[in-house]
Amino acid sequence: KANPDEIQQMYLMSDFVTAKSTELKIQIMQHFYKDQLKPNTKDNHRWWEVIDRTTDEVITNWDYDEETGEVIIHDTIPYHAYTVSFLAFVIWDPVHMYNALTNDWQGEEHQMTFDVRQPKTQKYVLDKFRKFCEERDDVDVVRFTTFFHQFTLQFDEFAREKFVDWFGYSAS
């Protein structure tokens, strides 16, 4: 919680949206569960990509309105389809979310994912592990018998399964 900028992230893609005029607004979180995912708007022109799917051209003339959650694409071609690929923070651990929704857990605090590759998070985890070992004189060896990986679970705006891959590591 102390470092929300170090929460695990994933790339998402908006729906295909057809332009009806020379400006198009795409609600990027439409059909995604807002309790699970939050767009990472830091340096979005570097990490996000807008594509004219009719021509496969990458579009650079766009802005993001954080208040409305819309990407505004300028100089669009009417009747061309466009998408936005964007980074989003995984603000609710997918496995915890799945269990909470499936089992109707009420009042359950949302567990967050964290990315141990990030410097502050890595330090936190290593310090906690060191402390665990130092406080236990009877422990000589710590054996990891399970390696944690994240299933890919994306839910829609109604908290239903949108995309689920129980066998992959794409959210790790």
Task: Identify what each model region corresponds to.
Residues 1-172:
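Glycan-processing catalytic domains of CAZymes
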